[in-house]
Amino acid sequence: MSINDDISSDVMRIRDADWNKRSGSKVPSPGDVTLSNGAVEIDATYLYADMANSSRMAKELDRRVTAKILKSFLASSSRLISHFGGTIMSFDGDRVMGAFMGDAKNSSAIKCSFSIAYSVTQLIRPKFESKYDTVKNAGFKIRHATGVDTGTVFVVRGGIYGSNELISIGRAPNLAAKLSDLREGEYTTFATKSVYDRTNKLQKQRLDGSSDIWEKRDWDFCDENITIYRSSYWRKPGSN
């Protein structure tokens, strides 16, 4: 068969297939979902962490230094997602996506986001600025943003045999990714009202009990005005 026959066959086969869908109580692994027509529907909270200024890093810094910064960000973010009970779903260049399930999924995702903010602002940025003058004197600061949303997600496998991965389809992963693109001053965590309302009290206040860590605002998404909450707060892992 020619390549045109192959892709035409793929499109028709996928279009005409009936989904073999089931509800999931945990985040599926690729082996849990058949490539042909498998799907798992889950209720999950998605976290999307994105390193800012990566294009400027690539332009202004030695590529070996840029690679170290990005690797540090992805390593620490991935470790924190796993630490707080999440599952790493995918990487996309300078971004990582995690999914959290269970009764505490929203609080766990927010705790994770606060700890990612700690790793960037209190570890990665100062440690690289202290070692490399080019980073310290660059026309930008090492920074990031994390978006968090929750909802029902349709998980399928995309790609071809031998080269495929899970794809998360739904508002939660899409909106979390869009929120991670926001660059608003020192704010690092952006969460939807759905997440904020279901997050426990400890993630709405500082360790000393003061409750000024979140700011409510409206945001336009796909022609819809939605309520989001943003925070510049960070918390060292293990503090609470």
From Swiss-Prot:
Residues binding Mn(2+) 1: D50, D94
Keyword Nucleotide-binding among record annotations: yes
The reaction(s) this protein catalyses: UTP = 3',5'-cyclic UMP + diphosphate
Keyword check for Endoplasmic reticulum: no
Places the protein is found: Cytoplasm
Keywords assigned by UniProt, alphabetized: Antiviral defense, Cytoplasm, Lyase, Manganese, Metal-binding, Nucleotide-binding
Residues noted as binding a ribonucleoside 5'-triphosphate in the record, renumbered to the chain: Y48, R95
Entry's Gene Ontology cellular component terms: cytoplasm
InterPro entries, A to Z: Nucleotide_cyclase
Binding site for Mn(2+) 2: D50, D94
Biological processes annotated in GO: defense response to virus
EC nos: 4.6.1.26
Ranges for domain Guanylate cyclase: 45-180
Enzymatic class: lyase
The protein's required cofactors: Mn(2+)
Listed GO MF terms: lyase activity; metal ion binding; nucleotide binding
Entry superkingdom: Bacteria
Known partners and oligomeric status: Homodimer.
Sequence similarity: Belongs to the adenylyl cyclase class-4/guanylyl cyclase family. Pyrimidine cyclase subfamily.
Function noted in UniProt: Pycsar (pyrimidine cyclase system for antiphage resistance) provides immunity against bacteriophage. The pyrimidine cyclase (PycC) synthesizes cyclic nucleotides in response to infection; these serve as specific second messenger signals. The signals activate the adjacent effector, leading to bacterial cell death and abortive phage infection. A clade B Pycsar system.
Protein name: Uridylate cyclase
Provenance organism: Rhodovulum sp. (strain MB263)
GN (gene name): pycC
